[in-house]
Amino acid sequence: MTTPPTGHPGQQFDHVKAASLPQPYAAGRYNPTVLAVCQGLFTCAISIDLTLTALTGWQLAPDKSLATLPFALITVAGALVTWFAAFLIQRLGRRLSFALGAASCCVGGLVSVWSIWHGDFWTFCAGTALVGVFQAFAQYYRLAAADAVSDEFKSRAISTVLAGGVIAAIAGPALAAWSKDLFPSALFAGAYLVVAVMGALSVLVLLLLYRDVAPSQGSADAGAQASAPARTLGRIARTPVFIASVANNVAGSMVMMFIMTAAPLAAVACHHRIDDGAAIIQWHLVGMYAPSFFAGRLVKRFGLGAVLMAGLALNLACAVTAMASTSLPAFYAALLFLGIGWNFMFVGGTTLLARSYTPSEQAKTQGFSELLRYAATALATLGAGPLLARFGWQTLNVAILPILLLSALATAYWMLGQRAGQPRPA
């Protein structure tokens, strides 16, 4: 079936010449690189917000019990918008939808600057919520890269996009520290101006360089299924490939946020310095994004199932290391294992998700999966502090073991189906 050209007029030429361009990317062959740049800009912006929003909230809040509300609204707004974002992308195309999402970051940053200048807490809440909207749209960057290529190249395309966060994960907190004092009379306003600039740059990059392309059908089998009636979401959700994708995306993100949120507090409680807690998180962020340079190649060499199981094993190593010792090297090692394990599970889980639907099923499947991931991440973020205070760091790590076990069982179930020659998707 031939997909009609979409987007701006220049893209029609891209569709005409697509067949003559080298695979795997055809007309959108630069899209993964463009999205990697956008991922870097997003990671810079969101890391500034995550670094300073709680402090800014404390500074502005009329009641200090509300100080963390602006921080929470980043995740809450993202969770509320993620389902809507999937259908907007289907209707308007990724180029325009992603640009609108990035524009919300620009507006949110400027609103935050204004609210700090005027000491308005509730307007600041609106600004951070708009950054949460940007986060919801940015989570689809990796899926956009995966959908544009055949099954063989999906994991590599996803890794390319996530690799954009490597430098940004380190640069973001550094930018936050540098820019927070740009305006001496308005502490933190300069940092949120940088957030607005990151959003504006993302808009320009997307509008000038990104190209909407028809989703790759991946194989002859997938091509035949593309012409079949769309399945219900319930039927898709019962397939082993979707179950395994959600198990890895949700478990990986939930465990990562649960441990990462508690780690700096636990380090200080174990008599390490506050600066050590911050350094542990930076090391963890390197672990999260640096494997993106080779995760796709590992999938091609060893297989998707092996990489997923390696991610689970690394998360288990994180828990075992944390339970064995509270020394500073143990914190560094545990958080490094956690970051790499998340990357393997996230790249692998996203690859499975991109294999679980046909083009007509894309919006609802992606939206539902991201909604589940956001909800689990929010739950982990909110629960980490109270559970750490009640049970302690080492017991906290025991709590992730059942989650990892469920993910391992779902992954093994999918792997057994693959070995038995089960058709995909079913």
Regions found by a protein language model. Give the residues of each.
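Juxtamembrane intracellular "pre-TM" segments in multi-pass secondary transporters
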Residues: 8-29, 211-247
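Helix-loop boundary and gating motifs at the non-cytosolic
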Residues: 21-79, 243-248, 256-273, 277
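Hydrophobic core of transmembrane alpha-helices in multi-pass small-molecule transporters
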Residues: 40, 121-136, 330-344
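Intracellular juxtamembrane helix-capping segments at the cytosolic ends
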Residues: 53, 136-149, 344-357
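Helix-to-loop junctions at the C-terminal end of transmembrane segments
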Residues: 81-94, 290-304, 388
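C-terminal ends and interior cores of transmembrane alpha-helices
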Residues: 103-118, 314-326
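Cytoplasmic helix-loop-helix junction between adjacent transmembrane helices
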Residues: 127-164
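C-terminal membrane-cytosol helix-exit motif in multi-pass small-molecule transporters
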Residues: 177, 196-220, 410-415
